[in-house]
Amino acid sequence: GFEEDTYFEQAAGHIRALPKLEGTVHVNLALVLKFLPQYLMAGGQYPEIPVRQDAADDDYLFAQGPAKGLGKIAFGPWRPALEQYQHLPNVAAFLAQVDAFAALVMTQPPTPEQQKDLDFLLTLGQLFTQVVYAQLVCEAAGQSRPGTVSDMPGMSEAHIDRIFAVFVQDVSEMAVGLHGQASATDGQRAAALALIAAPTIDAAAEQAFVDEVLQLSDAYVMPE
């Protein structure tokens, strides 16, 4: 009952972890920004990395050493993954936002003072991660990867367009946040406004999407 299963005992132990978690977010996003120039401007051609689902030793994940030289890591081009769906209105809008973001970071890069401003870096890092998430969605769409979070064989173009409507909206909100940063320069504020766009939402398609989601209500049952 209420007297036996109290929440406060759990809360007292868990609440102290929240500041640590928040600090981790800032640190991780600051580290992510080291990848930004090489990632956005990636033009090199590299062999495609296959999906592996075999039972193999993956201890290397936990023995990667210090986070040195992150800014020198090379990436394959991210754009082809998105361009295969650029005929979808929200994917096209998102690509335009990414181009505007690339122009911002290349022409109005963070100043030395801003590189010490965690609030500014957090907003910039969140904008950058949207591009990475979008690439992962497009690469996984329609792929069968049983037992993984990227198992999406049933994802249709309608699903992709609806997901990118969220990306477009989120990037716009983050751009407003960047525009309002106290340390932002006039040039950065002007460039941030170029990222603001409205997603394309078709009423009939939206209703079909909602109906599909509602059909999944109570479909999942927790294993015993």
Tell me the role of every PLM-derived stretch.
Residues 1-224:
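Flavin-dependent oxidoreductase catalytic core characteristic
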